[in-house]
Amino acid sequence: MNFSEQFTGRSEPGRKANRTSNNNTNSTTNVATVTTDDSNRPACDRCKGQKLRCIWENGSNTCRRCTRARAVCQQPRPRPFGRPRCSTKSKHHVAQNQANTKIWVSSTTQQPQENDAEMPMATSDDHDPTSFLSSTAVDLPRYLGLASFPTDPSLQIAISPPHGVHGNSFNLETGLLGNFSDAQFKNPATFYQPQGFINAANPATPAPVPVPASAPVSADGASLFEFDPDDISGDSEHSHCHWLKQLGDLNVAIYQHPLHPKPAGVSTPGVSTGFSAEQVSLSSLQIGRLLHMTSRLGRLTEEIDSADHVQPKNDGSAESDSFGGIKLAINDRSTLFVVLSCYVRLEETFAQALATVVEIRRRGPLSDDTYQLMPRLTVDGWSLECCQTMQIDFVIYICEQTLVRIRRSITSLHADM
């Protein structure tokens, strides 16, 4: 409205018509904006990050700015209303779970008593199978159920604790389990010569296995043991503890083998600290005993694996391939740890045996002891007793193949851990 219209109340017809058309156009634009704007929807991430107004069209999945920029338009997730949900576990269940994750730890200042005295306890980590070895005061034989080992007569070979290990203790440097009573060392009848091992005095005749005087005897004269050493199946109640005891016996027997490398400064009675290729003879290597323990460990591993899977993998024969492709599903990590410890010791022992035999083979002529590695090996009636070089080559091949399979098993066990 101009100056003349304000005082006269008149206006030109042309201007009034233009003003009316402009008002109609603005009203139409406002109506269209209101119908197309969806103000109930939240701003997208792009507009919210740039602190811009987000305008949504009805029936469109993208806002105006994202549509023009051809960008991805994402809406934030709606926030939950109210308080967060309370935990379903009560304090009683939490306290019970914490009590189940504790293990007994032997203290050097406090000894266990008979009148149910409490012992210091340490919490174990469920994700680390070796976390219970963080303290040097851990009573490992009692934790693994090995308080009464060695119990397997086929592996009890004059075992004696090394110097510096007393009572129920565990030496982390040597890894030797020292949980033996004085009566076992004073009574020679409690230790046996393994059945089937080669006798150094007469290789063709295996050493007999004497029966201890304290062993119970049935009516027919057969000795009765709590667990049969050759029967590794067992029932569901005692099989797991029986396997742990046999694995502990194997671990000690492998450590007592002459070819097992000994740490510096540790001297064990009856066990040499090392070998020299110029002084050692083939009769002192005890390779047959090492192969026997390896086969026994493979059978134990397969038996534990088949028990965990309910269905056995094979018939349990000693001639089966026991070292390749092991995939354990052991629920108790202590069993897996002991199995892995045995395989690691076997790897070190076979590596030492292979290096020693190769050095003897490279040295040239053999010694005058004429020890036969395989006295009964024949090919279609022809004996190989006089072919000592061929026998050594065959032993080297066996050690190489066994070492490869043991390392493959160690890799598989590490994957299970």
Swiss-Prot record:
Source organism of the structure: Penicillium crustosum (Blue mold fungus)
CDD domains given in the database record: GAL4 (cd00067)
UniProt keyword Membrane, yes or no: no
Superkingdom of origin: Eukaryota
GO MF annotations in UniProt: DNA binding; DNA-binding transcription factor activity, RNA polymerase II-specific; zinc ion binding
Residues of the signal peptide: none
Ranges of compositional bias, category Low complexity: 19-37
DNA-binding annotation, residue ranges on this chain: 44-73
Biased composition (Basic residues): 80-94
Keywords, in A-Z order: DNA-binding, Metal-binding, Nucleus, Transcription, Transcription regulation, Zinc
Protein name per UniProt: C6 finger transcription factor traC
Function: C6 finger transcription factor; part of the tra gene cluster that produces terrestric acid. The clavatol biosynthesis cluster cla and the terrestric acid cluster tra are both involved in the production of peniphenones and penilactones.
Gene Ontology, cellular component aspect: nucleus
Ranges where the record places region Disordered: 1-40, 75-94, 104-128
Disulphide bond pairs: none
Record has Protein transport as a keyword: no
Cellular localization per UniProt: Nucleus
Xref: InterPro entries: Zn2-C6_fun-type_DNA-bd_sf, Zn2Cys6_DnaBD
Bias kind Polar residues: ranges: 104-114
